[in-house]
């Protein structure tokens, strides 16, 4: 093999909106409410190996807006990307998939959610930036805690070992 074939390689093959749904169970009456809605946001990241060097990473977002006890809208979206990742050491692969890939995808998710909310007739809601490194580290700590509670060795996704 040549040196070029052994070089670390990272490429975005595709970014796409995998799924999106919007519900407005209390429309049109909710538009007459004068109170400001409370907004809850949930974000999750999942990754799947599609082939030896190909990964699908999905950033899911759920935004729920309520006025008093009535749901104004509920939007769920999944922004996905297919990434070609080669010649990356195992200890660097999981952080790349769990931090860098979601960081690339999140602006697309945020834009799609904001657009859908506006098109649904509501004032725009712009999701704040997310520190995917902190989210990743939190997940590793949870995995470590679960493994410790089960009496298993420390482990992280993709088989990397935590120190």
UniProtKB/Swiss-Prot annotation:
Annotated GO CC locations: cytoplasm
Primary residence: cytoplasm
Signal peptide (from-to): none
Family annotation (SUPFAM superfamilies): SecB-like
Location relative to the cell: Cytoplasm
InterPro entries in the cross-refs: SecB, SecB-like_sf
Entry GO MF terms: unfolded protein binding
The entry's keywords: Chaperone, Cytoplasm, Protein transport, Translocation, Transport
GO biological process, one term: protein tetramerization
HAMAP family with a match to the protein in the record: SecB
Subunit structure: Homotetramer, a dimer of dimers. One homotetramer interacts with 1 SecA dimer.
Role noted for this protein: One of the proteins required for the normal export of preproteins out of the cell cytoplasm. It is a molecular chaperone that binds to a subset of precursor proteins, maintaining them in a translocation-competent state. It also specifically binds to its receptor SecA.
Stated family: Belongs to the SecB family.
Name of the protein described by the UniProt record: Protein-export protein SecB
UniProt organism field: Burkholderia ambifaria (strain MC40-6)
